[in-house]
Each structure stands twice: as C-alpha cells, then as structure tokens.
C-alpha cells in the first residue's frame, strides 16, 4: 500500500485512484460474492475468492476507484494489440489492465489528460499456448539455416 505512506511522508503530492479489472468468468468484486468455479483464459487472475478481498475493497473506496470486468475475447484482443502496436508480449492477465484503461478513457471515466499507469507483470511466455492459439500462422515455409535465407523469407512475406 506504499502510495499512502509516501503521501503522508511528503514524498508524493497525491495518491492514485486504484482500479481493479477482472475477467468476467472470475469476477467476485463485480458480482459481490465468491465465484465457486472461476473460469477464464487469463489463468493468473482465475480467482474466485481473493485473499485480500477486504483490503482491495477498502483501497478502491478510499481512492475513489472502481472495479470492472472483461470477456476473454476482450482480454485476448488487448494482448494482441499490445504485441502488434507496442511490441509488448504479456500474458492475458496482464493485458486486462490496459483493456480497462482503454475502455475507461474512451468512456470518459478516466478524465482526459490523466496520468495512467498500467502494471503488466506477466510475460507472454508464462502462457505461450494461449498466445500461439491466437495467431494466424499462415503456411509454414522451410528454409536453410542461414542469415541470408532468414532475411529473404522475412522480406518475401511482408
């Protein structure tokens, strides 16, 4: 919870609004109750009964924050967007923070010109099968293992 401590010590001029985003199939904060059988492609947030439930609710309330949820389809679309546009290969659970920020900025819930920080802690290699299943692989090509062949294959397929 270091934000409050930094603010109280005079090391920060304000505290952030804390937002929480959950997958629709594992969204106890949205439902207001435990989810007995949470299900989502985002395995790192497949949690139906968070251990820090009370702390998360308190922090959200104190910071004027909120919770929201996203479908697996939205989460995967954001994971793909991050890879294609930013070169960031994160796991689905990390992509949800960006999905939330984008939606809330677009809707005006997050005001224009706000500073926004999205934490993406999970690398895409934590869940490579999900990422691979989302790829349009096209057809495979065989090449000789030389730099010239690799370069030619890339340039020929752009």
Predicted regions and their residues:
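Short glycine/serine- and small hydrophobic-enriched flexible loop segments
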Residues: 1-5, 58, 99-106
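Active-site/ligand-binding loops adjacent to catalytic centers
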Residues: 3-89, 133-158
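Substrate-binding/catalytic subdomain of NAD(P)-dependent oxidoreductase enzymes
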Residues: 16, 76-83, 87-106, 114-116
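A broadly conserved detector of short glycine/acidic/proline-rich loop/turn motifs that flank catalytic sites
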Residues: 24, 94, 122-123
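Catalytic phosphate/nucleotide-handling subdomain of diverse soluble enzymes
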Residues: 98-158
């Amino acid at each position: 919870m270091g934000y409050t401590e930094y603010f109280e010590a005079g090391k920060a001029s304000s505290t952030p609004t804390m937002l929480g985003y959950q997958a629709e199939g594992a969204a106890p904060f949205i439902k207001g109750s435990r989810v007995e059988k949470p299900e989502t492609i985002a395995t790192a947030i497949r949690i139906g009964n968070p251990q820090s439930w009370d702390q998360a609710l308190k922090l959200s309330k104190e910071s004027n924050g909120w919770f929201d949820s996203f479908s697996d389809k939205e989460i995967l679309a954001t994971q793909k967007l991050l890879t294609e546009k930013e070169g960031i290969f994160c796991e689905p659970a990390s992509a949800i923070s960006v999905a939330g920020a984008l939606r809330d900025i677009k809707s005006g819930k997050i005001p224009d010109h706000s500073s926004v920080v999205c934490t993406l802690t999970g690398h895409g290699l934590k869940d490579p099968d999900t990422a691979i299943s989302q790829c349009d692989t096209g057809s495979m090509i065989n090449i000789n293992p030389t730099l010239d062949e690799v370069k030619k294959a890339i340039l020929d397929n752009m």
